[in-house]
Amino acid sequence: MSRQVWKGSTLLNPEPPVLVSCGSPDKPNLITVGWTGTICTQPPMLSISVRPERYSHHLIKESGEFVVNLPTESLVRAIDWCGVKSGRDVDKFAAMHLTAAPAAKVGTVLVEESPVNLECKVTQVIPLGSHDLFLAECVAVDVDEQLLDESGKLCLNKAKLIVYSHGDYLALGRKLGSFGYSVRKKKKVNQKIIGANSISASRLEGSRAVNARLRAAHVRPLQLC
């Protein structure tokens, strides 16, 4: 394989282009964030990177709260639009016909049209350069009940989530496996069935041979039960 060496860049792809809601309930705002990720399990934490000059930056920094709304195929136009327009000039919720619904644990709002909403409280802000990194604890998750199966398990494959890759919005493709499948042992019940089938086949062949010899000796053949 032939390779070229480029200078260091931000080519870690794909990533979820999330809609982040922030601001007060009477004047909420939306910002599209392409750089976000899970950073801790206990406590549950995630991060978002925002340029200091963005209108939403000071809203998040002052309130210490925001909501990450997962991106879906039906939201792709709003996601793109909210990423290029400023909340200083327009009401993004109204312009994109989105519903600002009350959050359960934070003082800002969530996007009702998004199937999963992660309510977050900022724990630390780290200036990095072009962007500030907001570290936050996820204090609540709002889930559309239509994504739950009969046992209450969350089925995100029903949500039609999208990703962002080097300037393009992409739908997710087919399932390739589940966590741990590469080391998972085969179920023993299958092995037992295979073994039982092999024994039955061997017995049948043996019985056929015996019956053939009995016929040759003019003796009535055996009957398998």
Q: Where are the model-predicted features located?
A:
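Basic, polyanion-binding surface patches
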Residues: 1-195, 225
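Short, low-complexity intrinsically disordered segments enriched in A/P/G/S/L with frequent Arg
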Residues: 200, 204-208, 212, 217-224
